[in-house]
């Protein structure tokens, strides 16, 4: 008996293996004519067959034969004289084939013995139980549907293989069930977000991906050029200003799930191309947006994990209880009780402390931006359970409505979980004159060297001048939410094809 599987193939030169497989393909073309047939129609998947028949005993399957038509990739092969076994994997799982020379015929059996792991097979047969009780397909017809020319790796481990996992996601998905599960969960999460929004009477819309003026967030854009119009365009950094134009137009509850692009660094938390949901609702403020954010995240946890208590990096995260709330100064003092109110109101002390902690001074002037910079150094990473940080300074919130009680702050929040930002929302600024003044301030910051400051968007001001109702808005990062709910250490683990440096 000989046995092969993808975790125990002997080391062999890949070029030699591929040459041998190409020779086999040439022989198939010569003898069969059609090497990649497309007339086989699968009717059954592995997982439903196991679910329905694993508990059925051998005698019952023999008494009432169950005919099946299955197909998938061969992941294991055991050749034993006149009979062999093959384990085949489809999108739902794996099932074993029992292949006997007497059933499939001498020619097909001889062909099967030359086939390789990774080849895609189609089979017709009846269900059976082996001596060990494993549900299998006793094959009566067997076909090679697609020849695999490149051998599958044994497994992924270590840094080099982690890189390969991201670069060749198609291989990762073949051999790594955890990766397949992650992306199935991702799909469930996106579907759940959409269900929540539709259930709240929001309208799903699509807004431009290429903008004549970048806006809606503080970030560096990717720049491209429209040849016919001979003008620069920017891949969108956020859909915010277009979505709020729709609220002006009378679409009072809108949302969009789509990509944003930011021409910035890559890390375990950042990919230049990422997915967000942004949603806007007229006649509400940031309290309603926080309520919606909690609802979305809880529902996604229930859909993906079956519970609102999840584990991340070995530590529990409770998404079921009401999310905590702190102001920026409140969070700093909560996690750093040694700081005094006098220190936190002293611009010189704040600058000194930020530098002492290894942080960078913010480009935006003002005590509020310094407090935010200190928060990022000494408190943000400690926000493990869901926490809303509220009332951001006006100088770093150019699109948020100012507080009636304190004009130095805005009705803005960010949500932090496991020390990472997951959402950003606010009561929208709907005073066009105030918005124009803030845009001018952003332009001054850009002229002073702040690459992430916003441009002046005259058309958005024109839209606001028609009247933007009191509105709340929020954006939630889908990739980071998937990271949280799949216990993924890197954003690359939850994006099918993350950006990588050239090989």
From Swiss-Prot:
Keywords: Aminoacyl-tRNA synthetase, ATP-binding, Cytoplasm, Ligase, Magnesium, Metal-binding, Nucleotide-binding, Protein biosynthesis. It catalyses: tRNA(Lys) + L-lysine + ATP = L-lysyl-tRNA(Lys) + AMP + diphosphate. Its cofactor is Mg(2+). It is an enzyme of class 6 (ligase). GO terms for cellular component: cytosol. One of its GO terms (molecular function) is ATP binding. Mg(2+) 2 binds at residue 421. The keyword Glycoprotein does not apply. InterPro entries: Aa-tRNA-synt_II, aa-tRNA-synth_II, aa-tRNA-synth_II/BPL/LPL, Lys-tRNA-ligase_II, Lys-tRNA-ligase_II_N, Lys-tRNA-synth_II_C, NA-bd_OB-fold, NA-bd_OB_tRNA. Its main location: cytoplasm. Binds 3 Mg(2+) ions per subunit. One of its GO terms (biological process) is lysyl-tRNA aminoacylation. It comes from the Bacteria. The keyword DNA-binding does not apply. Its EC number is 6.1.1.6. Mg(2+) 1 binds at residues 414, 421. It is found in: Cytoplasm. Belongs to the class-II aminoacyl-tRNA synthetase family. Homodimer. This is Lysine--tRNA ligase.
